[in-house]
A protein has these predicted regions:
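Short C-terminal domain-edge/linker segments immediately following a structured domain
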Residues: 99-105, 134-139
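Flexible helix-coil linker/hinge segments at domain or subdomain boundaries
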Residues: 127-143
Length: 143
């Protein structure tokens, strides 16, 4: 399933990749041509990842491989929702300065194959874990 998240804080230029292990990891785990958008009103486009990472919205997981759980939390001080819910520390958080809304990312220890070749039990279990985290975080379930 497609998940997009805002990358406004991420990549101003490619030099940031050498400075931040999380950005390097994210870049390496991206699809070769992820969906991305400058403005969601105009829809999504498939672009090479070196172009896609410069867009405000990007597909965070590969089409058939899940590396991360992304959560969109639309309330003030949402960046600490994981702490307030007594959950493990996320891989990264990003907060919008104008309203305090946030994105929270958890990295899976092992990538999960989500294609028809993947384990149905593992996919089902991951979906339940993701739904449980979303509920505890008070995240947007439609994200």
């Amino acid at each position: 399933m497609f998940r997009a998240f805002a990358t406004f804080w991420m990549l101003q230029n490619m030099d940031n990749l050498q400075k931040n292990a999380q950005l390097t990891d994210f870049y390496q785990n991206l699809a070769y041509k992820p969906y991305c958008s400058e403005d969601l009103y105009y829809g999504l486009r498939v672009r090479p990842k070196d172009i896609a990472v410069l867009k405000p919205y990007i597909q965070g997981n590969q089409p058939s491989m899940m590396h991360y759980f992304f959560f969109d939390i639309d309330r003030e001080e949402a960046v600490l929702a994981w702490f307030d819910a007594d959950l493990p520390r996320p891989y990264w958080t990003a907060q919008t300065s104008k309203n305090g809304h946030a994105h929270i990312c958890y990295k899976l220890q092992l990538p999960l194959c989500t294609s028809e070749l993947g384990s149905k039990k593992a996919i089902s279990y991951a979906a339940k874990v993701q739904a449980g985290l979303a509920t505890k975080l008070g995240a947007d379930v439609g994200y």
